[in-house]
Swiss-Prot record:
<dbReference type="InterPro" id="IPR011990">
    <property type="entry name" value="TPR-like_helical_dom_sf"/>
</dbReference>
<keyword id="KW-1133">Transmembrane helix</keyword>
<protein>
    <recommendedName>
        <fullName>Uncharacterized protein TP_1014</fullName>
    </recommendedName>
</protein>
<feature type="transmembrane region" description="Helical">
    <location>
        <begin position="16"/>
        <end position="38"/>
    </location>
</feature>
<dbReference type="GO" id="GO:0016020">
    <property type="term" value="C:membrane"/>
</dbReference>
<keyword id="KW-0812">Transmembrane</keyword>
<feature type="compositionally biased region" description="Basic and acidic residues">
    <location>
        <begin position="586"/>
        <end position="603"/>
    </location>
</feature>
<keyword id="KW-0472">Membrane</keyword>
<feature type="region of interest" description="Disordered">
    <location>
        <begin position="586"/>
        <end position="613"/>
    </location>
</feature>
Length: 644
């Protein structure tokens, strides 16, 4: 009995194993069948749908295709169904099919590209751009670019902000600002310099060679935050240079200037760029000056071909000024002046900037005044030229008054030495009377029709420049009454009152636009009320944040520390003040004045005046260290003061 039971168990196990083996073989066979023949029912249904389409049985074909969607497993199957639905003009059904396919195969760019195509056909731009990230780096970037561009076009026409969502950001584009990008618009590293004068020594102004304005060739189309990859894809498909230029803009806007410049190499060597001035600007911003000069003949030739009022002429004007900037920045002043002269000859009606730059780089006073006079006669509202012209007039009169009596007597008798003849023939001629010009412009400014700086310049011409204080307080208070909240007027008035010892009036103007200088004057006012000199230190430290006031702030901190008996700290701050002033003015002289021109160049005079301050500050620091017994450091500073 026991033996029979054991035998039964063994047989049961054998039957079970045999059964499991048969089931396993069946499952494997089914898997192989599905992998090899599983698509045959789908292909048969697809053939049936094609037959119905051929028989023009549209309704039956669409119903069959709709049922097939539930049996589709691969992205190619969804594409096959959607293609036939589109052929039957059932775009809505095709869109649903593709969207279902995307949910199943999210990484297939073909499905998203076809969805974008369908949505663009129906002008559903906001929905289309939401699919753009799915086509990038999938070989379908061009359709994504088309969606973003069309959305931006519609947004600009309707006053909207499209694309408002879904604008694709690549690894670079995620830093692109919210402002719109415009067709062929350069956003380079240089600011447009409408104002070229800035405060120097609290009331004096220094002038600089003016850079050309950045190129702006726009069509008024707001194209926001589109990634460079999309622009490049559009360029690859169409070959249109505008797309390549906008890719360069996208890189430039996030500071990738060299990446923007490298895009120029995509233009074939046998093909000239459509906008040479654009690529010249990109090259300038990337520091590649050679391309600026290389493309200039093309810009000028196109301007000659298409005429004065063409876009090519506008590009040529910008390009010529840009070439002058590149030459000047490269240290070739003669070449820069040649470009500015060429600009004046070619475009005489728009040559204010070029004439002004020629004046600042002129080799002698006569040439400088002649260029300034042309500039003023062409545009008397251009403040930098008018201010320089007036100051040259003041300097010439002051020099003429200093002539000795013997020279005056000889000139009256008609007797001239070689030096007198040279001075006579090189003396500047002022065709416009500076005082009357400034008086006219000051009146215009008082009525809000001209730059307020003309009113300040006229005040400076009448009082500080003439070393005359009588009536100056009343004239300045009159300006403050006309311009009670103007920052420039309040700052100048505060400086002037301090200069003449009207401290209470200066303290009353402590609020002049905010910033470190206001903190400095508030600290002075507090110190004058409390009598504690150390209370001024906080304001002075804050004033060091302003670049133009840094050397003066360090010097004032040193003076306060010396009064407090902290001589070592005072010496350190005197050195900081001298070093800061040295860096600022030496750079200025090296760039703006060539060898042998220091006395002639308008920027050399204030810089030369600062040299005395350097010596005084280094010398005072050395004296303080000597008092502390630090003879080695003191001797080094005193030698530095003598060397400069």
């Amino acid at each position: 009995m026991v033996c029979s039971i054991t035998l039964l168990k063994v047989r049961s196990k054998r039957h079970l194993l045999s059964y499991l083996g048969v089931v396993g073989v069946g499952i494997a066979g089914l898997c192989i069948y599905r992998s090899v023949w599983g698509s045959r029912p789908f292909l048969e249904r697809l053939a049936r749908a094609d037959s119905l389409i051929a028989q023009e049985r549209k309704g039956a074909a669409l119903r069959g295709l709709a049922r097939m969607v539930g049996h589709a497993r691969e992205s190619s199957q969804y594409l096959s169904i959607a293609k036939r639905q589109m052929e039957l003009s059932a775009s809505a059904a095709a869109l649903r099919t593709l969207q279902r396919g995307i949910r199943r195969s999210a990484d297939d760019g073909r499905l998203a590209a076809l969805v974008i195509h369908l949505l663009l056909r129906e002008a559903r731009f906001e929905e289309a751009i939401s699919y753009v990230p799915r086509v990038v780096h999938k070989g379908y970037e061009s359709i994504g670019a088309e969606a973003l561009i069309k959305a931006a076009l519609i947004g600009s026409r309707t006053g909207g902000d499209s694309p408002s969502r879904g604008s694709f950001h690549s690894e670079r584009a995620e830093h692109v600002p919210e402002e719109p990008v415009e067709f062929s618009q350069v956003q380079g590293g240089r600011d447009q310099a409408h104002v070229t004068a800035f405060p120097l020594d609290r009331g004096e102004e220094q002038f600089r060679v003016e850079p050309s304005p950045p190129i702006r060739h726009t069509t008024g189309i707001a194209l926001a935050r589109i990634a460079p990859a999309l622009w490049l894809a559009a360029f690859g498909v169409t070959g249109m240079h505008a797309f390549l230029q906008n890719a360069a803009c996208a890189y430039a806007r996030v500071g990738e200037l060299h990446a923007a410049f490298r895009l120029y190499s995509r233009i074939l060597g046998t093909e000239a760029p459509e906008n040479t001035a654009f690529w010249a600007t990109v090259a300038y911003d990337a520091g590649q000056f050679s391309l600026v000069f290389e493309l200039l003949p093309i810009s000028l030739a196109r301007a000659d071909l298409f005429g004065t009022y063409s876009a090519a002429s506008t590009h040529a004007r910008t390009h010529l000024l840009l070439a002058a900037d590149a030459a000047f920045d490269g240290g070739d002043r003669a070449r820069a002046r040649a470009f500015w002269y060429a600009y004046v000859d070619r475009f005489p009606g728009t040559s204010t900037h070029a004439l002004y730059n020629l004046a600042l780089t002129a080799p002698h006073a006569q040439e400088r005044v002649r260029m300034l006079a042309q500039c003023v006669e062409g545009d008397k509202t251009y403040y930098p030229a008018v201010a320089c012209y007036a100051r040259e007039s003041i300097a010439f009169r002051a020099a003429h008054r200093q002539r000795d009596s013997v020279t005056e007597l000889l000139s009256e008798r008609g007797v001239y030495s070689v030096q007198m003849e040279q001075e006579h023939f090189l003396s500047p001629h002022f065709p416009v009377e500076a005082r009357s010009l400034l008086a006219e412009l000051a009146q215009e400014a008082m009525h809000g029709r001209a730059d307020v700086r003309f009113a300040l310049e006229y005040f400076r011409f009448c009082y500080p420049a003439q070393k005359r204080l009588q009536g100056s307080r009343g004239a300045l208070w009159q300006l403050l009454e006309v311009f009670p909240v103007d920052t420039q007027v309040r700052r100048y008035a505060r400086w002037f009152f301090f200069r003449i010892g009207e401290y209470e009036s200066a303290f009353g103007l402590s609020d002049a636009g905010g910033g470190p200088e206001d903190a400095f004057y508030r600290a002075l006012a507090a110190a004058s009320r409390t009598g504690r000199v150390e209370s001024i230190l906080g304001g002075l430290v804050e004033a060091t944040r302003a670049v133009e006031a840094r050397s003066a702030a360090f010097a004032n901190i040193a003076i306060v520390l010396e009064r407090m008996g902290k001589k070592t700290a005072a010496a350190e701050h005197f050195v900081l003040a001298a070093d800061e002033a040295t860096r600022e003015s030496v750079r200025q002289l090296q760039k703006e004045a060539g060898e042998g021109e220091a006395e002639e160049h308008p920027r050399a005079r204030p810089a030369a005046g600062k040299a005395q301050r350097w010596r005084e500050w280094y010398q005072r620091a050395g004296q303080l260290l000597q008092q502390q017994g630090k003879t080695v450091a003191a001797r080094a500073l005193l030698q530095r003061a003598q060397a400069r």
